[in-house]
C-alpha cells in the first residue's frame, strides 16, 4: 500500500519549538540517511495517526512531500506519549 504525507521544513529546532508544535497538533520529525543531509520536518498529527495503525506502515516505502518535493522514506523510529494516543516524534530513513 502507498502512503503519502504532506510536510514542511522546520526552521526552529529544539525542545521549546517542538513542544509548541505538539500543542498545535503537529508532529516534529527528521529524515536522515547515509550520504545525505538530515532534514527536520513537521506535519499534522492527523496525517500519521491513522496510517501508522496499519502493519505495513513500518515495512513499506512512504512518500513524504516536503515543500513540494517528493521523498521516498521508511519509518525508522517513533516516539509516543506515555498514556495518550499521541505521536511525539518520528525518525525516517531515506529509502
From Swiss-Prot:
Taxonomy, superkingdom: Bacteria
Keyword Ribosomal protein: yes
Coiled coil: none
Stated family: Belongs to the bacterial ribosomal protein bL25 family.
Stated role: This is one of the proteins that binds to the 5S RNA in the ribosome where it forms part of the central protuberance.
Name of the protein this chain belongs to: Large ribosomal subunit protein bL25
Subunit organization: Part of the 50S ribosomal subunit; part of the 5S rRNA/L5/L18/L25 subcomplex. Contacts the 5S rRNA. Binds to the 5S rRNA independently of L5 and L18.
Naturally occurring in which organism (per UniProt): Shewanella baltica (strain OS155 / ATCC BAA-1091)
Gene Ontology molecular-function annotations: 5S rRNA binding; structural constituent of ribosome
